[in-house]
Amino acid sequence: MLAQATTAGSFNHHASTVLQGCRGVPAAMWSEPAGAIRRHCATIDGMDCEVAREALSARLDGERAPVPSARVDEHLGECSACRAWFTQVASQAGDLRRLAESRPVVPPVGRLGIRRAPRRQHSPMTWRRWALLCVGIAQIALGTVQGFGLDVGLTHQHPTGAGTHLLNESTSWSIALGVIMVGAALWPSAAAGLAGVLTAFVAILTGYVIVDALSGAVSTTRILTHLPVVIGAVLAIMVWRSASGPRPRPDAVAAEPDIVLPDNASRGRRRGHLWPTDGSAA
């Protein structure tokens, strides 16, 4: 008897607070944590709101409740605060569930089917490209004729007629221009670079031709041999512009609508932290 009295006297003040008004607690539970004693009290006596909300939270999560559902429902019918809490938490849980269901379902990734990239279709040959192709062939033929030493209108007074090396350089340059013209006619993407080179070359060559023509150092036949380069420069610009396509008009791009913010909102990155305004569901 003395040992039992000693054991009963050693049970702590917190447990006695939990067991206040609770009847029928076995002596073996006196050493259990306060939460276990409180749940036991909820099954045999009036239920604490914290225990009821814990059981309701478990019900929403599909977990096993710590106390019988009948006792929870009985407490819920008597406690208006717990009813309001349960209504709010159930609404939030439904919103989260609908939000999760509205997200698109990503199908599982299977075996990656590697396919060959489709071959790039060449654009049809336009008259500009055909003309540039013909001019390039004519330029190659002109350079070849000059390379074989045939008369292409050079005079002895012309600076290139005095040196064989300068003549060879002129021949190489003429043939190279013809090859690039043919390439730009077949692949219009190369016409941009060709147009820039030929435009600069024709501008500088025109100055030399005018000076040599005034001094009588160049014949009319030699001047006519420069026409393929001039025509090629014009055609290269035309092919380049037709291949690049029309540029979009500035007014054709739709302006993005401005974001309308609430009156109490401010632009910029939020510096503070978000804190919950209600208690935890658990």
Swiss-Prot record:
It comes from the Bacteria. InterPro entries: Znf_put. It holds the Pfam family zf-HC2. Keywords: Cell membrane, Membrane, Transmembrane, Transmembrane helix. It is a multi-pass membrane protein. Residues 263-282 are annotated as: Disordered. Signal peptide: none annotated. This is Uncharacterized protein Rv0093c.
